[in-house]
């Protein structure tokens, strides 16, 4: 007859109680490690501590990223009534302007995967801080462009340095959260993009009144003043963004053990073996990868178009000059409010 200890050690993952979780000791093989327990309350406290350190900072980073990539849409028509808008002063046609927008996405597609590789090798806090400072400086540089080739080249560089952020943040969350915990947190971060759209319109309206200050057109001030926060915030990210649970100084030894156990099955680790060719082939031949690709393509096409052309569309509806900038705020504000429905969808998917 099995002893209580033997029974406890034979408990499978399917038999876990809601208030008692199984824990694997750090450094041990998950198939052979002896099992210990931790309570649901301990786990909730750990997740809450992680949320407070990671989510607000990650959302703020993505907010600045999206603000800097989409503000060219505001600059295109800012002070167009006096011919001090970006398109008029750089003497670009509508077709050329569209090409300048397109090259951003080309660079974005090329550099996403390499950037994620570097994020793991160089540590998340260091790599993301570097990306932030770089895209902030490049955004400021857009304020100094005066020709179509210059705009196109700078936009390509912007796409190169922004490419790794969102997929990098999604990958970064796998170091800290179980699979079922990630969707609501990704949604929280992604929602900051719509908030950036609302703030972008309001900021463009305010900065539009700076036209001619120190001899610079308002659209140049727009790039300078919206790129600067990314550069400055990079220093905060360098020191404040935690890299991995096993190294975060704010976690106790007990909390690190719980974190290790939580992620033993479906989390990512700081150190792991390289992907084999067989694993790479299995991933690339999985139809679900391309299904997700098609879905995201369908979502991104209209979303990217709206983020870049909403000011132009609004102006075409008859709103005049700076008023067109202000009228881009309500749609994004409503969209941000609707993002609150994501937790409900997560609960429905579990039912």
Residue map of PLM features:
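Cytosolic juxtamembrane N-terminal segment immediately preceding the first transmembrane helix
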Residues: 2-80, 88
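Extracytoplasmic gate region of multi-pass secondary transporters
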Residues: 73, 278-344
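Conserved MFS/SLC helix-loop-helix module at the cytosolic interface between two early adjacent transmembrane helices
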Residues: 109-151
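Residue-level signature of the transmembrane alpha-helical cores
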Residues: 61, 128-134, 138, 154, ...
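Extracytoplasmic
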Residues: 51-94, 110-111, 115, 164, ...
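Central cavity-lining transmembrane alpha-helices of secondary-active solute carriers
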Residues: 101-117, 329-342
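Central mid-sequence intracellular linker of multi-pass
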Residues: 2, 42, 48, 179-194, ...
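Extracellular/lumenal inter-transmembrane loop segments of multi-pass membrane transporters
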Residues: 75-96, 120-122, 140-152, 160-163, ...
């Amino acid at each position: 007859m099995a002893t209580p200890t033997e029974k406890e050690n034979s408990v499978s993952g399917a038999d876990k109680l809601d208030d008692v979780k199984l824990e694997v000791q750090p450094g041990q093989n998950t198939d052979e490690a002896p099992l210990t327990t931790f309570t649901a309350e301990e786990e909730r406290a750990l997740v809450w501590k992680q949320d407070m350190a990671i989510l607000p900072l990650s959302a703020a980073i993505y907010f600045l990223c999206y603000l800097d990539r989409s503000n060219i849409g505001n600059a295109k028509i800012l002070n167009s009534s006096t011919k001090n808008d970006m398109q008029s002063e750089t003497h670009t046609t509508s077709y050329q302007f569209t090409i300048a927008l397109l090259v951003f996405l080309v660079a974005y597609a090329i550099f996403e995967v390499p950037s994620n590789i570097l994020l793991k090798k160089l540590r998340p806090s260091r790599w993301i801080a570097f990306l932030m400072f770089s895209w902030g400086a490049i955004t400021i540089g857009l304020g100094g462009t005066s020709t179509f080739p210059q705009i196109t080249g700078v936009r390509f560089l912007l796409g190169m340095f922004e490419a790794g952020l969102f997929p990098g943040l999604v990958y970064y969350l796998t170091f800290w959260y179980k699979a079922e915990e990630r969707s609501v947190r990704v949604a929280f971060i992604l929602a900051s993009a719509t908030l950036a759209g609302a703030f972008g319109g309001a900021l463009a309206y305010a900065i539009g009144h700076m036209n001619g200050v120190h001899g610079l057109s308002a659209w140049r001030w727009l790039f300078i003043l919206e790129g600067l926060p990314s550069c400055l915030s990079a220093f905060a990210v360098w020191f404040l963004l935690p890299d991995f649970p096993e190294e975060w100084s704010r976690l106790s030894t007990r909390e690190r053990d719980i974190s290790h156990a939580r992620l033993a099955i479906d989390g990512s680790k700081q150190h792991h073996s390289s992907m084999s060719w067989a694993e790479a082939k299995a991933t690339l031949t999985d139809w679900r990868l391309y299904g997700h690709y098609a879905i995201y393509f369908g979502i991104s096409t209209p979303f990217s178009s709206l983020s870049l052309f909403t000011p132009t569309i609004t102006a075409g509806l008859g709103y005049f000059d700076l008023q067109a900038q202000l009228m881009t705020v309500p749609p994004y504000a409503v969209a941000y409010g609707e993002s609150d429905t994501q937790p409900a969808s997560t609960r429905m998917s579990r039912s």
